[in-house]
């Protein structure tokens, strides 16, 4: 799966590790990884105490490079949208998700993230009662999700998409 703007989320944890790829946007990810990638796959691993660790790091480096190529290609292959997403963090995440799905990326799960619900004041405005931080956040989510669903429908992909909203709030 792909997770946006937050790492180590519960939905992608296994007993051994986190199985998701963290993504802010495909272009930035691709530029960072390809700009720093050093192809050392064919170089011999030294027979030292750190040899296994070096082999692991090289494999992770290569896999990051390979995945960034695939993600970037999907983002670039997507048709241009005629819809306007809200210019918000969650709106941008929905827009990127739509691009990746439309571009043919076969990732089965996308985990978007909207922060800001941990409020202690101004959660609901005093007058009128439909203002405040909570209302603004839910409105942003609703507007962004609406555009995403309209785009999936326009692309003939709506029957392949299931949207679930969850909330995790707790004190440990």
Region roles according to the model:
Residues 145, 149-172:
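Metal-dependent active-site segment of extracytoplasmic phospho-/sulfohydrolases and closely related
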Residues 1-143, 147-154:
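Feature for exported/extracytoplasmic and membrane-associated proteins, marking the mature portion
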């Amino acid at each position: 799966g792909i997770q946006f703007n937050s790492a180590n989320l519960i939905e992608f944890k296994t007993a051994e590790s986190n199985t998701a790829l963290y993504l802010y946007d495909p272009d930035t990810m691709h530029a960072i990884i390809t700009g720093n990638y050093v192809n050392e796959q064919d170089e011999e691993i030294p027979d030292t105490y750190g040899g296994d660790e070096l082999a692991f790091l090289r494999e992770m480096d290569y896999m990051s490079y390979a995945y960034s190529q695939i993600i970037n290609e999907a983002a670039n292959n997507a048709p241009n949208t005629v819809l306007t997403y809200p210019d918000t963090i969650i709106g941008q995440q929905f827009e990127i998700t739509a691009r990746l799905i439309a571009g043919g990326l076969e990732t089965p799960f996308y985990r978007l993230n909207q922060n800001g619900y941990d409020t202690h004041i101004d959660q609901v405005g005093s007058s009128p009662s439909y203002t405040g931080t909570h209302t603004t956040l839910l409105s942003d989510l609703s507007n962004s999700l609406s555009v995403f669903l309209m785009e999936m429908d326009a692309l003939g992909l709506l029957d392949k998409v299931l949207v679930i909203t969850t909330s995790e709030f707790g004190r440990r």
